[in-house]
Amino acid sequence: MKRKWERDLGLQGRMLFTMFLLAAVYLFFLAFLSYYGTSQIFIILFIGLFMAAQYFYSDKMVLWTTGAQIVSESEAPQLHGMITRLCAIADLPKPQVAIVRTQVPNAFATGRNQNKAVVAVTTGLMDKLSPAELEAVLAHELSHVKNRDMAVLTIASFLSSVAFYIVRYSLYFGNMGGGRRKEGGGIMLVWLVSIVVWIVSFLLIRALSRYREFSADRGAAVITGQPANLASALMKISGVMDRVPGDDLRKVEGMNAFFIIPAISGSSIMDIFSTHPSVEKRIAKLEKMQQEMS
């Protein structure tokens, strides 16, 4: 049975405002580069080519980086059964299913759209969670698919990286079109502006990522009808992470932005620099939803 997908208007508003600010920063940056002598055609071609590559191949890169293996229904019947059932409720096409063989208990979703998605879980996650908790985590990842979070965050993060490398390239290899940048202090001004743009975009992307994690938690609660199951899963994953060997955590640290909980142990990082809200905040929101649904 399909469930009504109710939106959190406050959360949606904060996400839209953050995306608006990010777009404004990028437009300012590109206009600034153009004014100071960087060719507009070069910028458009450079961004266009790399965005296309990122859009079409990001899922393959993520699977290769993590060592995730696509599994068939015969290889993982329980996992496929859960995802098939959840997709019917969420009104989603069924994604490919993958397993990562690592002790780190985690999960992620990737793919450029709802028809080209992959949901992956680790063997550590399947070993540690109950079926109800595993289903809640899968629902969280499917919420990312439904909200197209992978495409949104990939594009947002990519533009930040492109802005940085365009400036770096221009500083090393000349004026890329001539103009005002040759005037005194021009190179230093471009460098200073690039630093400011990178810092601001970095913080905005982190904020956007945190909002979308909250949104995926809410989506999982709606799909399963049991917010408490996801809260329980988050507590277990967070607790187990502290006992996972450091070498295992370091092997997957590049995937932290994709995971349901970052693969870190010990001291936490400041919320403003994190891709995910704190587990405590997420659990508090889920507990509130559980009370509202009861």
Swiss-Prot record:
Provide the active-site residues from the annotation. Answer: E141
What GO biological process terms does the UniProt entry carry, in alphabetical order? Answer: proteolysis
Pfam family example for this protein? Peptidase_M48
Do you know which InterPro entries this protein is assigned to? HtpX_protease, Pept_M48_protease_HtpX, Peptidase_M48
Instruction: Name where it mostly resides.
Output: membrane
Record's subcellular location? Cell membrane
Q: How does it sit in the membrane?
A: Multi-pass membrane protein
Q: Which residues are Zn(2+)-binding?
A: H140, H144, E213
Q: Which residues form a coiled coil?
A: none
> GO terms for CC?
plasma membrane
Domain of life, per lineage? Archaea
- List the keywords (alphabetical): Cell membrane, Hydrolase, Membrane, Metal-binding, Metalloprotease, Protease, Transmembrane, Transmembrane helix, Zinc
**The enzyme's E.C. designation:** 3.4.24.-
Q: Which cofactor does it need?
A: Zn(2+)
Task: State how the cofactor is bound.
Answer: Binds 1 zinc ion per subunit.
**One function term, GO molecular function aspect:** zinc ion binding
Its transmembrane ranges are 15-35, 36-56, 151-171, 185-205
Record's family?
A: Belongs to the peptidase M48B family.
Kindly give the HAMAP family that the UniProt entry links to this protein. Answer: Pept_M48_protease_HtpX
Q: What is this protein called?
A: Protease HtpX homolog 2
Originating species: Methanosarcina mazei (strain ATCC BAA-159 / DSM 3647 / Goe1 / Go1 / JCM 11833 / OCM 88) (Methanosarcina frisia)
Q: What is the lineage of its organism?
A: Archaea, Methanobacteriati, Methanobacteriota, Stenosarchaea group, Methanomicrobia
